[in-house]
Amino acid sequence: MLKINGEIFGDESFWNKQAVYKKPKLNTDINTSTLLFESNKDIANLAMAHSYLNIHAPEQKKLLLMPYLPYSRMDREINDQIFSLRYFADILNNMSFEKILLADPHSKVSSDLINNLEELNIEDIILDEILPKIDIDFIMFPDKGAKEKYTKKYLKLCKKHKVIYGQKKRDLSNRGKIKEYSIIAEDIDLKDKSSL
């Protein structure tokens, strides 16, 4: 899904599957596009929105907010698969956003490839707004790499809770499909427990 200044852009279609683009309300200083990636259609909508903003609001700054970066996990060539992140980064860089705000770039490769990228710190949001509303026994990361990255990045959060992680075995000849998954919990009893 794509939003311009909080309003959904390009979510309707004509009978032939072409998107219906309604004129968005524009701000006088900064226009924010928010990419909530669901499919490649959202990237086409972003390109259309950006072109519209260039023509109808050329003097205003353009900001892109992306909680999730599409193709961030394709940060290198794997077997016969292309380095998709590089080409998506080219698409974003050609749009010349003044700033791109991202919740998690996944790897340093994203930061190296994308111009004007700033990472959002979501630790305080988790601590102040999410955790008070839920009861958790531990934090679970999907794999060892995520555990190593986020226990350093979200130190306050990880000091308050026990941490467990998953261990994946992938079939790289089959698009990285997970063949086996186990949970590494060391001495933590997982029965009837909840995690974030």
Residue ranges and their predicted role:
Residues 1-196:
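PRPP-associated nucleotide enzymes
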